[in-house]
Amino acid sequence: MSTNPKPAFRRILLKLSGEALMGSEGFGIDPSVLDRMAQEIKELVELGIQVGVVIGGGNLFRGEGLAKAGMNRVVGDHMGMLATVMNGLAMRDALHRAYVNARLMSAIPLKGVCDDYNWAEAISLLKSGRVVIFAAGTGNPFCTTDSAACLRGIEIEADVVLKGTKVDGVYSADPMKDPEAVKYDELSYAEVLDKELKVMDLSAFTMARDHDMPILVFNMNKPGALRRVIMGEGEGTIIKK
């Protein structure tokens, strides 16, 4: 039973890693994970929350690895952007199957596949209760999907960027490797930088800090966690001023 019946946020930007879509498959997209995420997003829409989504592409392609093997980094990043479009198409389809109205906007024009990114239209769609999925990152190489999430979050004036990961918040060390790792419930931007905690890459993090965009890190693989985050029930770690 929720102790706080009113949602803590009105408009959110949900950042999902491509890896989150893999489930236990190790590669590609696990349909059952996709459908569960679509259902969790549907719950938010039914609460009246406006939802923007940015998905990574790491389950299908990673530009960095090939860049180290000699591929041009720009080419690798373009391939990574296209991987996020593939994930976006899968997510849009899953949402439609869950009877949720969703639009896919790409930072790279892909006529006939999805809409071009348009800021004013995105906000209009969010206000009308549509889920808007932002694909192809920022449209520029050398920018991570974390940067894209913060950029789109700032552009659509979201209340928070929710970063869905494999762990249930920010820890003092990697909880998978260090049993002594301590979870933080709340941090300031300065504390994250001082403690050199890995929340997201530095350019994305400083963009959020400079625009006072709160970041909330939570475990997307934990059923019901997304709803608890939205209801302000102390799920995950929040980072703000």
UniProtKB/Swiss-Prot annotation:
Name the segments for region: Involved in allosteric activation by GTP.
23-28
Tell me the InterPro entries matching this sequence: AceGlu_kinase-like_sf, Asp/Glu/Uridylate_kinase, Uridylate_kinase, Uridylate_kinase_bac
Q: CDD domains in the record, alphabetically?
A: AAK_UMPK-PyrH-Ec (cd04254)
Its GO biological process annotations read: 'de novo' CTP biosynthetic process; UDP biosynthetic process
Query: EC number(s) for this protein?
Result: 2.7.4.22
Query: Which GO-annotated molecular functions does the record name?
Result: ATP binding; UMP kinase activity
Q: Where in the cell is it found?
A: Cytoplasm
| Location (main, coarse) | cytoplasm
Output a single Gene Ontology CC term carried by this record. Answer: cytosol
Name the protein family.
Belongs to the UMP kinase family.
Indicate what this protein is called per its UniProt record: Uridylate kinase
This protein's species is Shewanella amazonensis (strain ATCC BAA-1098 / SB2B)
